[in-house]
Amino acid sequence: MKKKLLLLLPAFVFAQSFIISNIPLPKTYIQNLSPLECNTYCMQNYLDNGQVFSFLAYAGSKLKDAKQNEARELFVPIFNLGSIHNSKQLKIALLLPYKKIGKYASSVTNASLAYLMTKGHPFMLKSYKIESENIEDLSSVIKRIHKDGFEYIIAPLTHTGAKNISNLDPTIHIYFPTINKQDSNSTSPYFIFGAIDYHAQSNLLLKEAYEPLVIFSDKSKIGKALAAYQREEFSYSSIDDLGSSSLFGNTFSIFSQINEESNKPIKQTTKEILNYSVSRRTTNLESYLKENEKIADATIIVNTPIIKTGMILSQLTLYDVNETNILSTQINYDPLLLSMTQYIDRKEMVIANSITEHNNILIETNALLGNDIEYDWINYTTTIGIDYFYSLITGDERTYNIKIKDNQMLYDIELLQPARSQFVRYIRPTRERDFMQKEQREEDQ
């Protein structure tokens, strides 16, 4: 026992306590002493020769060259470079109904933190957790946020929470990464909506659809809503317009849809549409698929989560459905699809994706925090919102070139296919059946 005490004695004698200092790290400022200008070629030459500080002397703001700007964004946090906006306070609050949004309370926080960490600007990011989204809780927390001196809020709320905040009508800037403006009646100039547009994605996908259209959905709100919308939209005769922007794999701009809204055609009700609602516990689709002539050569739409989608794809192959193609919105843009399904099951699949702008520095910084902004659209739209607020507060140019119209972020849409090991751009095949189906409808009329 004495020996043990003697062995522990040095540990007690030389023990130290470690407290994190509240003194901020010193900033690095690079002064450009050269009277000469430096163009893109000149700056690239500095990078190629490892003259990092000479490069940074000319890189005081966002650069036009994407690769050079990426290098600049990498060096700013490494050297803790000082910002010309150092005097401005950068304070952003996170309003988190953690019981409602689950894991996203953490991932939204990480996405916000990852973005601000790359900017080299002093910031205060504070989380305000609430148990419910009722008006009383929201009113109380917004008053507290305002009292604490915050004027910008990231609020990943459900539709109920967004509706209640809209009724409160606070005069404070709020960004909703989970809500699309078409799902809100708010006219507040202080609200910005950041969610992707499932309707626009469905419209683009339906241009690739054939009759009969078979819609598989789960019993969730989004599954039911998408099924109802797609069924309604496919009933319009011009939805299979041959002028689809995906013909050569081009990215579809949301503005083209806005311009076409006023030209919606007369409803065509003769199209054959089948709607199957699959419960969470259902694992066998034999009754839907086996020897079902109604779905031969059909277009299949899957409005189901990734696990359920994998089950549907495998059973489409098992029961020799011989579908023409399989369509899905952002729900199934997930690398898990590539590993959990066979290529033969997914080779005819087309997925709409609105995560079209990528910043490698932010992707890698998020990855260090165990976060994903490359495939998870809520984390991605959160990053877009933080970027927007950062630009408003500091006056810096935005990192992402996402347009805003009527307080809604407008995301371009691309159509992708899950190939053998990655998602690739979709190129529409020859569509002879379009003309055959059109002629058949004209004969029927």
What is each stretch, according to the model?
Residues 2-5, 9, 16-445:
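Extracytosolic ligand-binding ectodomains
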